[in-house]
Regions:
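Intrinsically disordered, low-complexity acidic Ser/Thr-rich regulatory segments
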Residues: 1-38, 48-53, 81-82, 87, ...
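Short, solvent-exposed loop/turn segments enriched in Ser/Thr/Gly
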Residues: 40-44
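Forkhead-associated
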Residues: 45, 50-87
């Protein structure tokens, strides 16, 4: 669910194995941000739900980073397992945030 930014209060239903890609490029992302969101890369990150383990797999592809609510920057191109309820931020600000429900 969107916590802040363009997609605040938006909900994205994800079945097991489903993947969302966040970014500014409609060719590379299915959750698309306007060009004014300079801290969001063309292909910023992907989020996949792993129903078997009841977790999300988040992979950062960006120049500006994807962060968890603890302020930890995810390592670029390295899938990271995150628990339900974790909040992720696209870019260095908390302008675009999503809770992994």
């Amino acid at each position: 669910m969107g916590v802040s930014g363009k997609y605040e209060n938006a909900s994205f239903d994800m079945e097991d194995g489903a993947e969302l890609v966040f970014g500014r490029s409609p060719q590379e992302a299915n959750i698309v941000f306007d060009q004014v969101h300079a801290d969001v890369s063309r292909k910023h990150c992907s989020v996949r739900f792993d129903g078997r383990n009841n977790q999300y797999i988040v992979t950062d592809f960006s120049a500006t980073g994807t962060y968890t609510d603890g302020g930890v920057r995810l390592e670029k191109n390295q899938p990271k397992q995150l628990s339900r309820g974790t909040v992720i931020y696209l870019g260095g600000s908390k302008q675009n945030a999503f809770r992994l429900n």
